[in-house]
Amino acid sequence: MATTTVPEFFRQFPMRQVRAADLDAALGDGAAPLDILFLWGHDCPNCDVAKRAILAAAARFRWPEVRWLHGNVYEEPELGTRFGLHGVPAFIVFAGTRKLGRISPWPGSDAFVEAIERQIAQHAA
């Protein structure tokens, strides 16, 4: 049984994988003004919908101010517990270690891009 219908996703849209134990250090390293943590799971059709949408217009989801991180909540259930998830995908937005917000479920490309660009503008102000 396949674990995803989008096996090429992380090769075509690179993100740093994080473990629950290392998340705070990654968020606090100052590598980018904002981080998006993509929480997903194997055999998750809604995660695959989001992955396909991101790949279909990858340039829209790349911002110089943003670093993407990802974690599989089935392999790292502590990530789901920490953020009180009831489903995936979920996208958590951070400025350093400060959580700015969560996008869940996948709202579609336009709404997602609009929400992130709003956070970028607010963070720059």
Locate the predicted segments by residue.
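A short glycine-leucine-enriched loop at secondary-structure breakpoints
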Residues: R82-H86
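Short pre-active-site segment immediately N-terminal to redox-active cysteine/selenocysteine motifs
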Residues: W40-D43, G87
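N-terminal leader/targeting and pre-domain segments
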Residues: M1-L34, A115-A125
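Typically the conserved alpha-helix immediately C-terminal to a functionally engaged Cys/Sec
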Residues: D48-R60
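Hydrophobic beta-strand anchors of alpha/beta hydrolase catalytic cores
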Residues: I36-L37, F91
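Non-catalytic, surface beta->alpha helical segment in thiol-disulfide oxidoreductase systems
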Residues: G87, I92-A125
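Thiol-based oxidoreductase modules, predominantly thioredoxin-like and allied folds used
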Residues: Q17, L39, W63-E78
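The canonical Cys-X-X-Cys-His
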Residues: C44-C47, F91
